[in-house]
Amino acid sequence: MCPADQTVATNNNDHLVQSEDPEHPANLIPELCRKFYNWGWVTGTGGGTSIRQGDHIFIAPSGVQKELMQPHNIFVLQWPTPKYPASERNYIRKPLKLNPSACTPLFLTAFEQGAGCCIHTHSQWAVLVTLLVEREKGPDACFEISNIEQIKGIPRGKGKGMLGFFDTLKIPIIENTAFEEDLTSGLEAAMNKYPDAYAVLVRRHGIYVWGDNTAKAKTQCESLDYIFQLAVEMHKLGLPWVK
């Protein structure tokens, strides 16, 4: 190791990702990524997860097999931090030989809205519903479904409680881009148009889901994936999504 590399290694704030607490973000993110991999949400290194804890943001790296991720692979940003340009983001801990997640500006967008955790998956069911909505309702329509019990697992909006059985769940859909970072403006626009939404679908790509904390983001992501799978099966049977 050359002197410059020794300096980086010595001053890399590794203590930020070292904890015996299973609820520590550096331990939670690899554990969540393993679960998501087993559920088929983050195959082929796709997807990502980020958690905000106080003035620190913990982010899964780019290009690491999600089922093999370890705490020492996690990036840490000082919060708040500039979203753009990428070179101005205040990383206070960088794993050697790994690249920051391409999802970073999208995660930061969720944190700007007060989220405590943001999850990005490549769920097949999420992709399929974006295609069905485009074919049936056009490219500008959002995903809508009502009268499904699992809708109760999705917030009505910040401080507004949860949706009810008779409510209509609406999830905006944005178009995919060639590069992940370029989705940011679309995500921001969708958040502005649907301020009560806790998720945004990306056509032919996947979904971003955020929550007030890690548990809420995870359970909301689970509920949505269940709903999307149900919606695909309902469509096969000719059943309407909204009564």
From Swiss-Prot:
Active site (catalytic residues) = E149
State the free-text cofactor note: Binds 1 zinc ion per subunit.
Its GO CC terms?
A: cytoplasm
Q: Which domain of life is it from?
A: Eukaryota
Q: Which InterPro entries match?
A: Aldolase_II/adducin_N, Aldolase_II/adducin_N_sf, MethylthioRu-1-P_deHdtase_MtnB, Salvage_MtnB_euk
Instruction: State whether keyword Cell membrane applies.
Output: no
Provide the alphabetized UniProt keywords: Amino-acid biosynthesis, Cytoplasm, Lyase, Metal-binding, Methionine biosynthesis, Zinc
The reaction(s) this protein catalyses? 5-(methylsulfanyl)-D-ribulose 1-phosphate = 5-methylsulfanyl-2,3-dioxopentyl phosphate + H2O
Which stretches are transmembrane?
A: none
What's this protein's family per the entry? Belongs to the aldolase class II family. MtnB subfamily.
Name the UniProt record assigns to this protein: Methylthioribulose-1-phosphate dehydratase
The scientific name of the source species is Penicillium rubens (strain ATCC 28089 / DSM 1075 / NRRL 1951 / Wisconsin 54-1255)
Tell me the gene name: mde1
